[in-house]
Amino acid sequence: MLGALQIETRRVGKNLTMEAETTPPSAELKSLWNHQKEMSERLTDKAALISTKELHRAVMLVMADRLKATIDRDADLMYHSCEDYIADLKVVQRSLAEANAKRSAYGPLQDLIWQAETFGFHMVEMEFRQHSVVHSRALEDIREHGLHGERGELQPMTHEVLDTFRALGSIQKRNGIKAARRYIISFTKSAQNIRDVYELNRLAFSHPKDVPTIDVIPLFEQLEDLQNSVDVLEEMIKIPEVQARLKATGGKMEVMLGYSDSSKDAGPTSATLALHSAQERIAKWAESHDIDLTLFHGRGGAVGRGGGPANRAVLAQPVGSVKCRFKLTEQGEVIFARYGNPALAIRHVESVAAATLLQSAPSVEKRNTDMTAKYADMANKLDEAAHNRFLDLLNTDGFAPWFSTVTPLTEIGLLPIGSRPAKRGLGAKSLDDLRTIPWIFSWAQARINLAAWYGLGTACEQFGDLNTLRQAYEEWPLFSTFI
């Protein structure tokens, strides 16, 4: 990314050929030029030789050379943050605008500023993710044996956890905080899970930090966790490190919701309704605390993992949960289908972006709120019936061995696909220990799409009012999207 910015900065700068007589540089630009000269007369002399009387161009050429120094890790000349680079670009832009060269100020130069603001020096942000139990076990290991193994050898997993935080810190040091600042906790159960991560981050560097530079993101996955999410968040914002991050980010907070495990845990119908309810409650909670919330949707590609048309899913979100922002995972099995062709990729992104803007319109928010209230009783009845039916299946005697027999579960577990093992722990014996991907894929390979619908038919049949179901399908986006 730095190389691309360097090339573009030089290209934009070379086109700023206006002389000082026709486009007088501002005092702010002259001050920036003097600062560059103090930093390196070699660079300013080279730029001045090329750009006699063209100060806007000369400043941009020095900026391009400083980006090259950033790539080379030249501590004396490098930009230490993308924000400093953007600030210099805006000095040039303001100078051009004040000189009435607005086409130059808001043309390719503006595009360059947008690129830098969007991608930074790192282009793509790296996110880290680990199971909450791994953190708690690592802390137990450290308390028992000492941080440096004073009382016995630490477990390999503990070393891996500490090394992960050190790697995160190294990435931030080299590429800026925004390059790697999000740490997701799978299976968040309580606020203690968040405390564990900040404690491990502190221990990894063997010294306390004044203000932490990572945002810990709780991931609520199972039905009970979704139901308790607001209580956990209420305790979470009392943690000093979380308060420090909220202050540092201007009140921004991210919360992730898991579609896959909630579906496996409660069945597709109950999971859909529980996720919708959780989003609604979390959005209201965030608003009450003046928190700028982003909900991160951990949707899979398969319908049983929350998959389906993303634009329709956006339009079905509850009021206050989008606010012109929609973050979601794109699973490996759908990446080629959505992004393998440039035309399809553009169409998909435009479709989701349009839905995100439309969902934030007052009329759409009001419709979703009204329809959720109108069909709340129906939803509760469908939820109870579908959940009971799904649990009846899972609790049927002999279901687990039958599932292993009629589907290629064992073989899928051996495939070198995915970023995590098929089961949680080497001794996993039950369906509870089975990860969602092999659960979904095993059904799919047996040509049984059970994970996407099981329990819904029974729930609709027990509800009995076909006219109400049809009306809900026409009026309530959540219900029609699910169907």
Predicted region positions:
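Extended, charge-enriched "interface" segments that sit outside catalytic cores
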Residues: 11-174, 463-483
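Generic, well-ordered alpha-helical scaffold segments in large soluble proteins
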Residues: 4, 8, 15, 91-95, ...
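Active-site cores of enzymes that catalyze phosphoryl transfer or operate on phosphate-rich substrates
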Residues: 51-52, 59, 118-199, 203-207, ...
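Short glycine-rich or small-residue beta-strand-to-loop segments that form or flank ligand, phosphate
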Residues: 93-97, 183-186, 216-219, 296
